[in-house]
Amino acid sequence: MSRIGKMPISLSNQAKIEISDANVKVTGPKGTLEQALVAQVTLQEENGVVTVQRVDETKKSKAMHGLYRMLISNMVEGVTKGFTRKLEIAGVGYRAELKNDLLALTLGYSHMIYFKAPDSIKIEVPDQTTILISGIDKALVGQVAAKIRSFRKPEPYRGKGIKYEGEVIRRKEGKAAGK
């Protein structure tokens, strides 16, 4: 049995879950999330605890069991607490600022890069070298953070670029001087 899939999901008193045949809907103080279900898994809710079970023992069912348990767990956490990713900008002259609802990035190119986040994602810029991305959908928060990071990935020689908080950049030695 899947070690992740067999763990129950406890609902806080703030989160409500609605289970139908084809999808599951989780509602909380921060918003509502919906997820389509596959035929290989079934959900049961009793006394504020949701359990995910698979219908048979095929390889596909075993794979879906753990996946859907984590997806639903992330939905519950998202509508109650929310998710945040922090990006750090390193480099001379590299900076970020918020102009209306656009994120304006100066990253050493000949032009500025403007990024508009999806409606459910909130972007904050506490200072010029820090970007905070928050929302209720964990996958979407990560996707937006990865998209912003892709504008200037950290390079290994000087470490300039956009990196996740706590990310360690493997540094390389420059060319050795020849004779």
Swiss-Prot record:
Keyword check for DNA repair: no
Keywords: Ribonucleoprotein, Ribosomal protein, RNA-binding, rRNA-binding
InterPro entries tied to this protein: Ribosomal_uL6-like, Ribosomal_uL6-like_a/b-dom_sf, Ribosomal_uL6_a/b-dom, Ribosomal_uL6_bac-type
GO molecular function: rRNA binding; structural constituent of ribosome
Subunit comment: Part of the 50S ribosomal subunit.
Role noted for this protein: This protein binds to the 23S rRNA, and is important in its secondary structure. It is located near the subunit interface in the base of the L7/L12 stalk, and near the tRNA binding site of the peptidyltransferase center.
Family named by the database record: Belongs to the universal ribosomal protein uL6 family.
Name this polypeptide is given: Large ribosomal subunit protein uL6
Gene: rplF
